[in-house]
Amino acid sequence: MPRSSDQTRPVILQAAYKLFRRRGFFRVGMDEIATAAGVTKKTLYYHFDSKDALLTAVLASQHERAFAEFQTYGIDLSGGAEQLIDKLFAGLATWSAKPRWAGSGFTRLAIELADLSGHPARSMAREHKTLMERQLATLLAEAQVPSPAERARELFLLVEGAMVMILVHGDRNYCTAAAAAAKKLVVGVPAA
């Protein structure tokens, strides 16, 4: 039985996401995405008029999921900034332990498209990172951390750096080191 248009779009997005994440944007073709989604190429182009449009839609979908999850980090801040930092880096350690983890797809994509500054996916990646940093600043403000926007930028650098080092070395202990540095930076807690 054929799927409805409402059911087809999410299937295409998920298939494209998996392929882009696993192999990168340039190494995946529309034929392969159509096959993975179980649709014809005509159906794929009915929903997305180009590979660039599909990639932008994939990123928008992933942003919604990641941002919604990240917003839950601030539900209970009774432990203050230290608890927030623990949760942030424990989340990164858990995420990086998943099979086939390859870091932030947004970061990887920005690198892959580095020479295409006007590409809509680069704009989407920039918007995602900006909104995540702002949300972190909001959480730090709620935890009564002074200069929350400045601290959020510094923490975000630690998170991104930890992701890169985990990818390079395959060692999740970089999360522990980044968390210790974050605590020194934000709450003045000496490393354990």
Task: Describe the function of each predicted region.
Residues 118-127, 141-192:
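Hydrophobic/aromatic-rich alpha-helical bundle segments in the mid-to-C-terminal region
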Residues 5, 13, 59, 63, ...:
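Amphipathic, non-transmembrane alpha-helical scaffold segments
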Residues 37-48:
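Short hydrophobic/aromatic patch on the recognition helix
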Residues 51, 62-66, 77, 81, ...:
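Hydrophobic/aromatic residues within well-ordered alpha-helical segments
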Residues 57, 71-99, 152-155:
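Hydrophobic alpha-helical connector segments
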Residues 97-119:
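Amphipathic alpha-helical segments used for helix-helix packing
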Residues 55-62, 69:
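Alpha-helical DNA-contacting segments of helix-turn-helix folds
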Residues 1-23, 27-36, 52-56:
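Basic, helix-initiating cap at the start of DNA-binding domains
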